[in-house]
């Protein structure tokens, strides 16, 4: 079955998501703000869930239409082939949002969509009551300037939940963003990665998984596992393919340090859970003592800053030390994510390249130095 799907993502990562989907052989890939649309079959759906490093989830797009009245919304939703996805005992909650639209009340839209789905299923299953005790089929809707998109969430718990980080430090970076920073830094399997503010190890772990080509979702489950819509053989085949693509004989190392001994302990535990502990070298150390011993290195880091853990004055003092330690040298690149507009001034050098990204709700710049 040919499906249209969409992969929501953090703002600024649309290009990375589109490119990884193309590499997975997705068809008709098009990027919009905060999401990427693509086409494929059920195997592609499984492949995207298992392999995407940068998307937040994978949704099936059931329809896109214009609606300015509740009747138009009801009839358009009712016409959709819900019984192809939702069984007679399955659970189907509804959530979504409305922006700059005539139908602006989200609770009212939820009720109308739920009612329309129920009426459609009543006709197909010839029953009047749904216990909703079976697998969850999360229905999502978006209404933007009267344009409605109706979707089914196939992922469940967000794709950033890889399963290796049940514990984290006070200000963790999102896994999808950490993977993106490593990719934007052009990290390769023969590089040496550094993070002198490693926290609970997310950048080091995501970098190691990227270098070894370990699929982020290879060891987790998804909402649509229990639907039966994707054949079990497709899941087995896609997981087997992901295992075959893992690189085991690579010349890769990742060095991490942090001032907090507990953070180093967390990093070691999380790396072991992610099965990349063999690549990591960890130490409790201050940034003032940063003194790498390798000739080449790719440094990617998310230092503490005013809106997270330090006040602005402390953060800018930290940036000055970083500027002294991260000096230009052949074979080295440095990537620092920060929301501080004064970062370059404090660091002492203009970035060779900048990219606007969001760390949670905080607007940041990813400052890249490679010359």
PLM feature segments, named:
Residues 173-292, 307-308, 312-314:
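Conserved S-adenosyl-L-methionine
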């Amino acid at each position: 079955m040919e499906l249209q799907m969409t992969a929501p993502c953090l703002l600024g990562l649309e290009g990375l998501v589109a490119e990884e989907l193309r590499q997975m052989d997705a068809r008709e890939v098009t990027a919009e703000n905060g999401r990427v649309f693509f086409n494929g079959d059920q195997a592609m759906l499984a492949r995207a869930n298992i392999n995407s490093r940068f998307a937040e989830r994978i949704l099936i797009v059931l329809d896109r239409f214009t609606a300015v009245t509740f009747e138009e919304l009801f009839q358009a939703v009712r016409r959709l082939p819900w019984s192809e996805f939702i069984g007679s005992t399955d659970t189907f909650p509804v959530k979504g949002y409305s922006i700059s639209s005539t139908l602006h009340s989200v609770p009212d839209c939820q009720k109308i969509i739920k009612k329309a789905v129920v009426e459609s299923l009543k006709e197909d299953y010839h029953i009047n009551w749904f216990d909703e005790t079976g697998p969850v089929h999360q229905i999502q809707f978006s209404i933007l300037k009267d344009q409605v998109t109706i979707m089914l969430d196939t992922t469940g718990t967000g794709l950033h939940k890889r399963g290796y980080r049940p514990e984290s430090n006070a200000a963790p970076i999102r896994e999808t963003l950490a993977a993106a920073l490593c990719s934007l830094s052009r990290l390769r399997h023969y590089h040496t990665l550094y993070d002198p503010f490693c926290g609970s190890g997310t950048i080091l772990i995501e970098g190691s998984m990227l270098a070894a080509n370990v699929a982020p979702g290879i060891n987790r489950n998804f909402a649509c596992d229990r639907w039966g819509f994707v054949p079990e053989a497709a899941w087995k085949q896609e997981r087997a393919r992901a295992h075959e693509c893992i690189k085991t004989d690579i010349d890769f190392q990742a060095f991490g340090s942090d001032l907090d001994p507990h953070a180093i302990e967390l990093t070691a535990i999380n790396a072991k859970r992610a099965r990349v502990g063999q690549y990591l070298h960890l130490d409790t150390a201050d940034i003032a003592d940063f003194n790498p011993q390798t000739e080449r290195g790719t440094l990617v880091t998310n230092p503490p800053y005013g809106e997270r853990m330090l006040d602005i004055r402390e953060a800018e003092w930290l940036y000055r030390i970083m500027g002294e330690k991260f000096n230009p040298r052949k074979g080295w690149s440095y990537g620092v994510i920060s929301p501080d507009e004064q970062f370059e001034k404090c660091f002492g050098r203009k970035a060779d390249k900048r990219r606007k990204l969001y760390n949670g709700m905080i607007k940041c710049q990813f400052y890249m130095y490679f010359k």
